[in-house]
């Protein structure tokens, strides 16, 4: 029970009375807003972001509470803070007391896998594929390090006539590599969940944003191989760990253990309910 309470307090750091904003909604109003979005999108043919998975993930938990309860929320990739406590999918790790994390858009962000490939037979290389235009960090990374011999990195979208453009690579192919870069995009690195559930090791700078996965609790060189923000030491660190496979296996085991806490769906639902219950208690 202590581990559950610890996670609830991590996601929801509010411990004093607060005022809702004028935009706060009941669950019925949340539903009505979503229907308006869908009408604009499909009937009026307007370019409105549906955020359907966000809506269902919040609506399903919100529905357990009295109809008069209200909350503030913001869907999407959130990297800023709020003047009043607000339900979000992601937040900055530092100074984000008013950002209350819920497990939103889980279908995209919580993809754990069973890796059939033993670490010892994987390639002594580092892989990354992804969308680069949503992150200056990713653009810098691939433009400056695409030609490192032990890296197979590149953007698969958008398509560009540049040497760092590479074809899409499915997860099953990426799992053939011992080292997998997890580079933050619009907010967090989406691939971090499946990488940390695999028999490969996550390589990344210290994360700046977090989600329900609690990226802020990950320990460098314990749960992942830590590299500098400018990636300048990535090649040296990977070469070091290629020569020290037992150290890598320990990191992978720690990462797998961290992932295990998210696999009990009944427990995850309970934590979600308790996060909102704490929100409404103030």
Regions picked out by a protein language model, each given a short descriptive name:
Residues 1-198, 205-227, 237:
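Nucleotide-sugar donor-binding catalytic core of glycosyltransferases
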């Amino acid at each position: 029970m202590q581990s559950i309470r610890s996670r609830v307090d991590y996601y929801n750091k509010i411990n004093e009375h607060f005022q809702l904003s004028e935009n706060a909604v009941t669950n019925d109003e949340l539903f009505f807003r979503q229907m308006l979005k869908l009408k604009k999108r499909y009937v009026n043919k307007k370019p409105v972001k549906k955020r359907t998975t966000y809506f269902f993930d919040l609506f399903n938990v919100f529905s357990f509470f009295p109809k008069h309860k209200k909350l503030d929320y913001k869907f999407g990739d959130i990297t800023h803070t709020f003047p009043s406590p607000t339900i979000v999918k992601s937040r900055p790790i530092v100074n984000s007391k008013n950002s209350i994390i819920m497990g939103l858009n889980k279908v995209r962000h919580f993809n754990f896998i069973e890796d059939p490939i033993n670490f010892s037979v994987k390639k002594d290389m580092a892989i990354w594929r992804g969308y680069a235009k949503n992150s200056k960090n990713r653009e810098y990374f691939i433009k400056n390090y695409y030609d490192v011999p032990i890296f197979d990195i590149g953007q698969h979208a958008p398509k560009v006539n540049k040497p760092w453009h590479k074809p899409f690579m499915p997860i099953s192919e990426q799992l053939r590599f011992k080292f997998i870069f997890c580079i933050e995009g619009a907010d967090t690195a989406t691939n971090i969940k499946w990488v940390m559930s695999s028999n490969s090791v996550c390589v990344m700078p210290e994360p700046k944003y977090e989600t329900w996965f609690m990226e802020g609790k990950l320990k460098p060189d314990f749960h992942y191989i830590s590299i500098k923000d400018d990636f300048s030491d990535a090649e040296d660190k990977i070469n070091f760990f290629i020569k020290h496979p037992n150290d890598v296996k320990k990191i992978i085991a720690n990462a797998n253990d961290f992932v295990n806490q998210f696999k009990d769906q009944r427990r995850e639902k309970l934590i979600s309910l308790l996060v909102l219950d704490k929100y409404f208690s103030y």
